[in-house]
Amino acid sequence: MEVERIALKYALINAIEHGGKANPKAVIGKVLGENPELRSKAREIVPIINKVVEEVNSLSLDEQKAKLMEIYPEYFEKKEEKKEEKKGLPPLPKAEKGKVVTRFAPNPDGAFHLGNARAAILSYEYAKMYGGKFILRFDDTDPKVKRPEPIFYEMIIEDLEWLGIKPDEIVYASDRLELYYKYAEELIKMGKAYVCTCKPEKFRELRDKGIPCPHRDEPVEVQLERWRKMLNGEYKEGEAVVRIKTDLNHPNPAVRDWPALRIVDNPNHPRAGNKYRVWPLYNFASAIDDHELGVTHIFRGQEHAENETRQRYIYEYFGWEYPVTVHHGRLSIEGVILSKSKTRKGIEEGKYLGWDDPRLGTIRALRRRGILPEAIKELIIEVGLKKSDATVSWDNLAAINRKLVDPIANRYFFVADPVPMEVEGAPEFIAKIPLHPDHPERGTRELRFTPGKPIYVSKDDLDLLKPGSFVRLKDLFNVEIVEVGEKIKAKFHSFEYEIARKNKWRMIHWVPEGRPCEVIIPEGDELIVRKGLLEKDANVKAGEIVQFERFGFVRIDKIEGEKVVAIYAHK
């Protein structure tokens, strides 16, 4: 029937482009949109299309591709012809070949996440594009509120390496305190900075009214004496702070005479210990380092745009040229937590298993879940330098990852919630199934059916198994269902796939005996565990990404004796 043929074509295309599941509404829209003469018969046609979609969705992704190749090979030819032009990054303003210097400045107080990765990848890719230099600068000068921890220095370097980012230089801000002191003293001598000993609430009251603090215009000698007292320990934490002189009428009160250095008693810093008690705040240390390290271009989240306003005062006072700043919006994944403070709290409360809990959006969590570094990079380059915030759905990231893992992931059968099936009248048979349908050179896996021994099918497929119905056991044979209960009784019908295809019998996967397997599925804030059986001889290794046919792509998390534990990535 013509309608069935058209519907099959569009259902297969839609399924292949959406991880193996066709959307009935999309297929109906496509069929009627491109064949307007059928609209008058919509009432009769829609049930036919829905039935075709249901049949297509019962096939594995590989079977869908094979079927589309059979009925509409032009789809693959067209795809090959216009193999998507890789989206690249736009040119960088004021960039000269060989002279671009970028930096990524994470705070090592937690593992870094997809949002942070945007600045890291953009900084690295642009430095590479222009044959320049990429610096990793640890912003670790807050030993009080955002305390750095040794483990996170290592994690960040590991995560960057996994993303393919190799810094040309690694700088630790906490190793450079003497340098910051030198510039602070110069600014005090120039009359561009001063030591304020006002109570914080008193200073805020004056600042908000645009009134100078009483210490602002005191002589340089008095300021230097106070500065020495800060360094010598004569002031306690909270009693004195170095401020940069700015415009007291600036529309943003936070810019007015902003704090540059403050005292931290007993900092107990992981690198500097208690050697120093005067610590620079982010905007001061960052401004000095960007100049000292020769940074030419800064990639900064739009929400931090005001940092540039503050830092420009220092550049103006010293007569330096401020780096070109490229602002971009925040990047987040729908329904996935990226906040370091919320993640830390969840870990401390036992809600999350660690910084690589697969429910999180940290780089290590995405890696553990089976997302490839190339997928993260492609997503970030695709989003590019947009100033608006971007929230991507998990489906967006999964679609990019799917096309990357599909060619490399070997195929196996995993039967969730196994139910035994006895097949009467079937001969002994060894099913030889390709490890990958597109790569015969990888070899085959063998599953043996032995008469008198049960095989196992998934409880998920019980709705398809009604007494008197027929199904095809994938790569094995066709059976008629006789009885459905705690075990399923069936009888052998035939070997030929063509018979099942012509009769439109559903296809299900199976295993003879298998090894125990658990698949952990992140679902919102929950972790769902599906227990079942994996092919007994499945040669999988921890860290490998494979496809469990008709289930989805998974990453093998660990192997505990016979048991395999995998984490679900996506369809």
From Swiss-Prot:
Pfam families: tRNA-synt_1c, tRNA-synt_1c_C, tRNA-synt_1c_C2. Signal peptide: none annotated. A motif ('HIGH' region) lies at residues 106-116. Its main location: cytoplasm. One of its GO terms (molecular function) is glutamate-tRNA ligase activity. Keywords: Aminoacyl-tRNA synthetase, ATP-binding, Cytoplasm, Ligase, Nucleotide-binding, Protein biosynthesis. Its EC number is 6.1.1.17. CDD domains: GluRS_non_core. InterPro entries: Gln/Glu-tRNA_Ligase, Glu-tRNA-synth_arc/euk, Glu/Gln-tRNA-synth, Glu/Gln-tRNA-synth_Ib_cat-dom, Glu/Gln-tRNA-synth_Ib_codon-bd, Rbsml_bL25/Gln-tRNA_synth_N, Ribosomal_bL25/Gln-tRNA_synth, Rossmann-like_a/b/a_fold. GO terms for cellular component: cytosol. Catalyzes the attachment of glutamate to tRNA(Glu) in a two-step reaction: glutamate is first activated by ATP to form Glu-AMP and then transferred to the acceptor end of tRNA(Glu). Belongs to the class-I aminoacyl-tRNA synthetase family. Glutamate--tRNA ligase type 2 subfamily. This is Glutamate--tRNA ligase. It comes from Pyrococcus abyssi (strain GE5 / Orsay).
